Design a protein with these regions (language model features):
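An N-terminal boundary/leader segment
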Residues: 2-4, 8-12, 28, 33-39, ...
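A short helix-breaking turn/cap at a secondary-structure junction
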Residues: 141, 146-150, 157, 162-170, ...
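Glycine-rich, small-residue loops and helix-cap segments
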Residues: 146, 159-160, 193, 248, ...
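Gly/Ser-rich, acidic/histidine-flanked active-site/gating loops
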Residues: 165-167, 176-179, 184, 212, ...
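Conserved hydrophobic/aromatic pocket- or pore-lining residues that grip, position, or stack substrates
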Residues: 204, 226, 248, 254, ...
Length: 630
């Protein structure tokens, strides 16, 4: 999903106790107070719908027609079924207990019902027609903008990292060794003309087609586009124009990221034939850097977990397991050497979980680092895009390429990163939680980093419930039409989004805003207790996943080893369970987490291990599609 996800942060202008991290575009305070009252009353009335007689068929058809773009039919100003209900016992009397607001007498309840029927329900319908006629949150973003910064400045646009120079990189003799090279190594082969982009594209497309039947990691092959982009990359190099380390390098995108002329399915059977005439900002950045798109990779349905309309994506290290998290395709494909890198997304765990399960290095960056226009939205205050790579060095190269201000994403900004390749480790104080992998602590300590025991202190009792309230309401706003037309009945996993989004209908606006105020309190308390430059902890601890996404903390997921699988087959197997840790930093300090991860990986080789995808054991088989050479 998310693995989980949270909704957009709100703050009323002028509120003395509101968090400084929750900003509102200029709107008069009085307008917001009045709008807030309308929203609260209407949410309550809508939640009481089951107590109201169902609308007649003509009214139902009118409501459905209201979603059609360009419809000129006037919306009904009043709903006779509501008026009919108001004439008897107050409809809200029984419903208010679901909102913990059963505090009004019958007279006040009737007054609320009449006001909602006259003012709020018509306004709701008009607003839905204006902004909710298309699902996915691609258009009409909210003007309420979450800023995760702890006071950092915006960086100059041209301030980029100083990448290490790789000398004496030689082309391996076989394609598999090439497939598991890092981005910088492949870039050096391209730059020195030891290999062409066309050749690399051939290698990775063959691997994708060979191993996808078992991993179920690809939704769409972008073969024609890939060869066109590879041809351009090779021609530019012949002309003496080198675009940088991503020049001619193949990659994959999670299939919630729009690319013109190709399907963007969001992993959902409802949208499996959808083609968007949109070019996502992150795709533009990669195209400008010379990268070659070879595939749209699996997203869990509507960016939730690893189940999608074509199956369920598997873990290359143990095909009896699944990849876990909605960026399943990017994680599995990178792990198996099917692409050198891929771009995924996280709202709550969809980068960290699949990276940890599949044993790849990944970066969930500071919120706002990478523009999200052209990307399906769950929560505008939580959604983030980040890279899956074979090393932290490659993650640094990728984030340097895709970061920056997206003019169509109000939350994106020029984050003031320092160069991770020039961080003085001996000046850092790094905390470690009880859940930290001790090998990482020992290795960094031996390299001059000061390591101290650490714990974050905050008073919020349940960060998970805070995350869920926020996420579910925001997601429902982006998929209101989808739910109203009954498409949730078609959803691939009925215990996931359908249940959560139905429950989201019962979140009052007042309590949603209280949740955002609580989020602001959490941010302040985490900032006050964050007395170190970074800390090391479990990358998949659910409390940390929820907290990190609510606050906007960056984290690098780092492979640290392997354990044996549970109940291995008697004949033996090379399947293993990956072990990882997370290196967390304050917002805008991604370079510190990257520098620490690079330091650890410079003296270890866990991240360079290859999954046993061709030698899984006597009871495992890898299907080879027809007309595809091994």
């Amino acid at each position: 999903m998310p693995f989980f996800t949270t909704a957009r942060a709100l703050r009323c202008s002028g509120g003395a106790t509101a968090s400084p991290h929750l900003h509102v575009a200029t709107v008069a305070e009085a307008t917001w107070r009045r709008a807030l009252f309308y929203v609260v009353v209407v949410v309550v009335v809508v939640a009481a719908a089951e107590a109201v007689p169902p609308p007649s068929p003509p009214q139902s058809r009118t409501l459905e027609r209201s979603f059609e773009m360009g419809s000129k039919e006037a919306l009904p100003a009043k709903d006779s079924s509501i008026k009919e209900a108001i004439s008897g016992k107050p409809v809200l009397k029984d419903a208010m207990k679901f909102f913990d607001a059963d505090i009004f007498n019958d007279s006040k309840l009737r007054e609320m019902e009449e006001g909602a029927e006259e003012f709020n329900v018509p306004a709701f319908r008009v607003n839905r027609k204006l902004v909710a006629s298309v699902d996915g949150g691609l258009h009409n973003p909210s003007v309420l903008v979450f800023n995760s910064s702890w006071g950092g400045k915006e960086a100059p646009q041209d301030k980029r990292f100083d990448y290490p120079c790789l000398c004496n990189v030689k082309r391996p003799s076989n394609d598999e060794d090439i497939a598991f090279m890092t981005v910088l190594e492949l870039g050096e082969l391209i730059r020195t003309k030891q290999i062409t982009s066309r050749e690399l594209t051939d290698i990775f497309l063959k691997r994708l087609k060979r191993y996808d039947p078992v991993l179920e990691a690809v939704i769409t092959f972008t073969e024609d586009l890939a060869y066109r982009q590879a041809k351009v990359a090779d021609e530019l190099l012949e002309q003496g124009k080198y675009l940088g380390p991503l020049h001619g390098i193949p990659y994959g995108l999670k299939d919630i990221i729009a690319v013109p002329h190709y399907k963007t399915t969001w992993g959902s059977k409802t949208f499996k034939d959808q083609v968007l005439d949109i070019e996502a900002w992150v795709y533009k950045r990669l195209k400008s850097a010379g990268a070659v798109l070879v595939a749209k990779l699996v997203s869990g349905s509507l960016a939730y977990d690893d189940i999608w309309f074509g199956g369920r994506t598997r873990n290359p290290w143990n095909i009896a397991e699944f990849s876990t998290g909605s960026s399943a395709g990017p994680a599995a494909s990178t792990s198996a050497g099917l692409v050198p890198f891929a771009i995924g997304s996280e709202t709550a765990g969809s980068i960290t979980y699949p990276a940890a399960r599949c044993g790849v290095t990944s970066l969930r960056p500071t919120f706002g680092t990478v523009g999200r226009s052209g990307v399906m939205s769950i929560s505008e205050s939580l959604d983030k895009l980040g890279p899956f790579c074979r090393s932290a060095v490659d993650c640094a190269v990728l984030i340097d390429t895709i970061r920056g201000k997206d003019p169509d994403d109000l939350s994106s900004r020029h984050v003031e990163f320092e160069d991770p390749f020039h961080v003085d480790l001996e000046k850092l104080t790094v905390g470690y939680l009880e859940s930290a992998e001790i090998e990482v602590v020992d290795v960094l300590s031996s390299m001059g980093v000061k390591l101290v025991p650490f714990k974050l202190n905050y008073s919020v009792e349940s960060v998970q419930s805070l995350l869920n309230i926020t996420m579910d309401v925001d997601m429902l706003a982006h998929f209101d039409k989808w739910q109203r037309l009954g498409h949730d009945d078609e959803y691939e996993a009925q215990d996931q989004w359908p249940v959560e989004l139905r429950r989201a209908r019962l979140v009052p606006a007042v309590d949603y805003i209280q949740a955002q105020r609580t989020r602001g309190k959490l941010i302040r308390e985490v900032r006050e207790s964050f007395k170190v430059d970074a800390f090391i902890g479990n990358a998949t601890d659910w409390e940390l996943v929820c907290l990190g996404n609510l606050v906007g903390l960056p984290v690098v997921v780092v492979p640290t080893g392997f354990t044996t699988i549970e109940d291995p087959p008697k004949g033996g197997t090379r399947r293993r369970t990956t072990v990882t840790t997370g290196i967390y930093a304050p917002p805008d300090r991604d370079h510190i987490a990257l520098a620490l991860a690079m330091a650890y990986q410079s003296v270890t080789d866990h991240h360079l291990q290859r999954p046993p995808i061709d030698d899984l054991g006597p009871d495992d088989e890898i299907p080879v599609p027809p007309n595809t050479k091994p």
